């Protein structure tokens, strides 16, 4: 099956923002390449990249409208003040398209939660693990991006048993699935991209939680409130959706917001402060997680 491939050359400082943007609009996989043309995955939490210029490459489903994709990318890059020109082409499937999966390893978040690529084994150090098995080819946002890592670590320590969760902008469904594996009663995954919802369904089935996962397009408002709301999307979108997101938690419900660069945190906090008692911002690399309890 052919793919639609996007190359975006950017400075190192902008690479993670572009990576998150591509995830948000439905990329199936994302890789980073340095000036030496050596592919790299997003580093594990706490690690640093060593190059100054990066090409961010993403694959989209073959049915993706290239003109609409270009327009969406150019608009979003302009909003992020990133001076970059996307190169979009059709790519025929080859074996090396998934070769980067060889470098994807089991990762732990918090005390219990592990994300493990299909076919790999847990390391000996894992004790009483909660394991999510994923095909990384279906799931960008498999914990390797700092924003996803922040959310997964927060979920690992959250009071989830018996709770209802909404994952707004669910992408591949990793946060909703993690919540269910950690004891949530039901999760609702919401996304504007039909391909993201398909990937979420496949990942949920892989992990045996499909019967407790509701998936819906973001054009349709959620049918009920929830105890925990998670949104790992761009800061500008969080601010625009602040009123809608604030209407979703039950009284005393919790919210976790990510996809936010450190210098955007105060603007996001200001948008949500009228609705939530916000806690101290959590940081990882240049990204933050904002959590709070509904007033």
Place the predicted regions along the sequence by residue.
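Conserved hydrophobic residues forming the short capping helix/wall of the S-adenosyl-L-methionine
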Residues: 73-77, 204, 208, 272
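A short glycine-rich, Lys/Arg-flanked "PGG" loop and its adjoining helix->strand segment in the class I
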Residues: 239-254
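Short, conserved active-site loop motifs that form the nucleotide-linked donor/cofactor pocket
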Residues: 113, 212-213, 253
């Amino acid at each position: 099956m052919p793919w639609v491939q996007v190359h975006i050359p950017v400075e190192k400082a902008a690479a993670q923002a572009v990576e998150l943007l591509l995830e948000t609009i439905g990329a199936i996989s994302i890789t980073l390449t340095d000036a030496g043309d050596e592919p790299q995955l997003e580093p594990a939490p706490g690690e640093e990249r060593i190059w100054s210029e990066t090409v961010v490459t993403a694959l989209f489903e073959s049915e993706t409208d290239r003109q609409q994709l270009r327009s969406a990318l150019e608009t979003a890059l302009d909003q992020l003040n990133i001076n970059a020109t996307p190169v979009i082409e059709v790519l025929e499937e080859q074996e090396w398209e998934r070769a980067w999966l060889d470098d994807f390893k089991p990762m732990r978040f918090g005390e219990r939660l592990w994300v493990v690529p299909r076919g790999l084994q847990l390391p000996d150090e894992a004790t009483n693990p909660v394991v999510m098995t994923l095909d990384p080819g279906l799931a960008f946002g498999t914990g390797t991006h700092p924003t996803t890592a922040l959310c997964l670590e927060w979920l690992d320590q959250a009071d989830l048993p018996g709770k209802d969760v909404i994952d707004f902008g669910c992408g591949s469904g990793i946060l909703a699935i993690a919540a269910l594996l950690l004891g949530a009663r039901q999760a609702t995954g919401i996304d504007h991209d039909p391909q993201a919802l398909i990937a979420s369904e496949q990942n949920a089935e892989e992990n045996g939680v499909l019967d407790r996962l509701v998936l819906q397009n973001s054009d349709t408002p959620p049918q009920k409130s929830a105890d925990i709301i998670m949104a790992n999307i761009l800061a500008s979108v969080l601010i625009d959706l602040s009123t809608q997101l604030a209407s979703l938690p039950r009284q005393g419900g919790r919210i976790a917001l990510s996809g936010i660069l450190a210098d955007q945190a105060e603007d996001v906090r200001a948008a949500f402060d009228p609705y939530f008692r916000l806690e101290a911002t959590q940081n990882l690399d240049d990204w933050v997680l904002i959590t709070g309890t509904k007033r």
